[in-house]
């Protein structure tokens, strides 16, 4: 086998090893939390937060960000079809499941991402959504992170008792490029949610949201490059520009990963290892803690839960340099970042 050739900044053509890449004033090294350690290793958990609730699986592609969907890629690796949409059997009631001691598996105060292998507002899921809303209604002590590319469907899908919104729902729209930001953020603003954010992932084109941040409704912005099959490049200049807009508005900004193809100072880098991507994102110094987000969580009786009774995220040493550290719900001890 021919040896790999070493390029500038320590990268090898065709493979990435734990060597340094200089991004601005910060040195980036390999390392941390991955979906898989190489292109063909599949992880069961797809998460930058502590846990995930997938009440249904499968989706229909609807915009540019869907082109190289990670769920389709992972399903294909399992000889499954990502376009087949079905209600999950054991996972549907997950937020209500208890351990052997009778306590909820998901603790009060945790933040759970919903439908990470689908879209919560998918038309095909209409028959199941009311039951999912009921589960979130029962777990008013847990924050549910909703992310959609279909904000135009949301108002018609809200439960009858929604009112001005539930405090335990954090609603986000995907803005993979400027076209989708200009299309979806105005719809986001028109919807009755108490907590709103946006996610530029896959980040496949420059996005400016300064005019939208000025409205004061957006509490958090997440961005990250594209991964898996046929990943499109993420440009560090886009990240820096978006971050500055968030800093100016005092809105939390989190750069979770570079993506497989990353461009910095005109140079193109191939980084198939998501551990490396995550650590590089952290070491870039882009993450910014803006105004804190307060979720007023209540117990089964509707009483406020004291702060000392809420889940406290715990982290291990490797977590300290993870790109998602700023917004993560804590280490799940899955052992995959060792």
Where are these regions (language model features)?
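Auxiliary Fe-S-binding modules of radical SAM enzymes
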Residues: 2-12, 19-23, 29-57, 210-338
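Conserved Radical SAM active-site core
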Residues: 20, 24, 32-169, 178-181, ...
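Anion (oxyanion) recognition and catalysis
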Residues: 137-140, 192, 240, 247
């Amino acid at each position: 086998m021919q040896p790999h050739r070493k390029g500038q900044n320590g990268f090898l053509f065709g493979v990435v090893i734990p060597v340094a890449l200089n991004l601005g004033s910060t040195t980036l090294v390999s390392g941390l939390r991955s979906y898989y350690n190489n292109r063909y290793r599949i992880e069961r958990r797809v998460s930058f937060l502590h846990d995930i609730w997938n009440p249904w699986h499968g989706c229909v592609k609807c915009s540019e960000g869907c082109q190289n969907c990670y769920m389709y890629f992972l399903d294909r690796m399992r000889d499954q079809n990502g376009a087949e949409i079905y209600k999950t059997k054991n996972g549907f009631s997950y937020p209500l499941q208890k351990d052997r001691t009778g306590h909820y598996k998901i603790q009060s105060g945790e933040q759970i991402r919903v439908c990470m292998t689908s879209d919560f507002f998918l038309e095909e899921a209409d028959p199941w959504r009311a039951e999912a809303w009921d589960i979130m209604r029962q777990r008013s002590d847990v924050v549910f992170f909703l992310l959609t590319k279909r904000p135009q469907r949301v108002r018609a899908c809200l439960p009858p008792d929604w009112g001005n919104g539930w405090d335990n729902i954090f609603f986000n729209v995907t803005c993979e490029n400027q076209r989708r930001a200009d299309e979806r953020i105005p719809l986001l603003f028109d919807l009755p949610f108490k907590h709103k954010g946006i996610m530029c992932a896959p980040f496949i084109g420059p996005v400016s949201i300064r005019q939208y941040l000025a409205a004061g409704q957006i509490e958090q912005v997440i961005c990250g490059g594209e991964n898996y099959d046929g990943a499109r490049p993420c440009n560090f200049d886009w990240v820096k520009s978006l971050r500055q807009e968030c800093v100016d508005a005092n809105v939390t900004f989190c750069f979770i990963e570079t993506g497989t193809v990353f461009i910095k100072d005109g140079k193109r880098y191939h980084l198939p290892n998501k551990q490396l991507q995550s650590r590089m994102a952290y070491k870039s110094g882009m993450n910014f803690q803006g105004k804190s987000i307060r979720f007023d969580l209540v117990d089964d009786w509707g009483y406020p839960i004291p702060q000392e009774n809420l889940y406290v995220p715990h982290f291990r040493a490797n977590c300290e340099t993870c790109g998602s550290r700023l917004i993560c719900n804590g280490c799940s001890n899955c052992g995959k970042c060792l």
